[in-house]
Amino acid sequence: MFRIAVDCMGFENSVSEAVKAVIKYAKKHKDLSFVLVGDENQIRPLVENKKYLNYRIVHTTNEIGMSDSVLTAYRKKDSSMYLTIELLKNNEVDTIISAGSSSAYVALTYNLIGKIHHKIKVGFMSYVPTVTKRGFWFLDVGANKEYLGEELYYLGKMANTFITSVFNYQPRLGVLNIGAEKNKGFEYHQVVYNLLENDKTVDFLGFIEPRGLIKGECDLLVSDGYSGNLVLKSLEGALKSVGKILKKNYKINPLGALFSANVIYQITKTFDYKNNAGAVVLGLNKLVLKTHGSADAKQFYSTIRLAHESLLNNLIEKITKECSTFLN
């Protein structure tokens, strides 16, 4: 039985959003055990009558705020995030999920859990929908702002292993850049390009421009965390704006909206990022996942699903084994 700990506090929505997702997922997957970390007075009434739910509660009323510094996060050893990470550190659970502060989460997991290898940097890996049937996986989207070319290469290799292990296909890998030409970008772009180009274990496409992402030009995109976060938030903002435009036109022309309802439904369903809101924190010794700071039950649910799929496919074991082939 896999054990999943969920940090139920420290994000923009209420505790109930995290708990509702756990309840819904547990109903379909009774082979899982959950540890809910947060205010028991808020959690207990939501779960006490759910006979199918295998759970325990780790009580705390303290949380790490989104604006708290990393130093403050370290001092809050009784916070929901810190206690959640300690559960994984002490092998009381198999994976953890949080929607809290990204900077605090990366710093605490890095120090309490540790990295697979000292040469790598950890990265957030998120799924982005496209106009094609299959979207693409994108990292780093915010864990680390700067990378050396070798570090981006290692990140790409780990992400490649993640996709082949969990989803059973060989991804077409690209590197984010302002142009597709080989000489574009900074020095680290040239380094990672040459390393990937000469690696026969990956299907390397070359540099990918942001305008080609929604068209599905690649299955896996590698970037530094600063650029990656900018692009991801720009895409999310653009897709939300499209949704608002569609809703506005419904009101102006309800008859036209009626006839195009199915098409509109398919568009909104395809680009609903909440269906794939989980980010794997690649590079750590144990399985750690992050979801949006504004996560609702739907986003927590999709993150739990990704955690479960990763556990079923022994993700960390496979990535560690893969790292041993190119790191020493």
Curated annotation (Swiss-Prot):
Record keywords: Cytoplasm, Lipid biosynthesis, Lipid metabolism, Phospholipid biosynthesis, Phospholipid metabolism, Transferase
Documented EC number(s): 2.3.1.274
Gene name tied to this protein: plsX
One GO term (biological process): phospholipid biosynthetic process
Entries under PANTHER family matching the protein: FATTY ACID/PHOSPHOLIPID SYNTHESIS PROTEIN PLSX, PHOSPHATE ACYLTRANSFERASE
Catalytic activities: a fatty acyl-[ACP] + phosphate = an acyl phosphate + holo-[ACP]
GO cellular component: cytoplasm
Gene Ontology MF terms: phosphate:acyl-[acyl carrier protein] acyltransferase activity
Localization in the cell: Cytoplasm
NCBIfam families: plsX
Role of this protein: Catalyzes the reversible formation of acyl-phosphate (acyl-PO(4)) from acyl-[acyl-carrier-protein] (acyl-ACP). This enzyme utilizes acyl-ACP as fatty acyl donor, but not acyl-CoA.
The name this protein goes by in its record: Phosphate acyltransferase
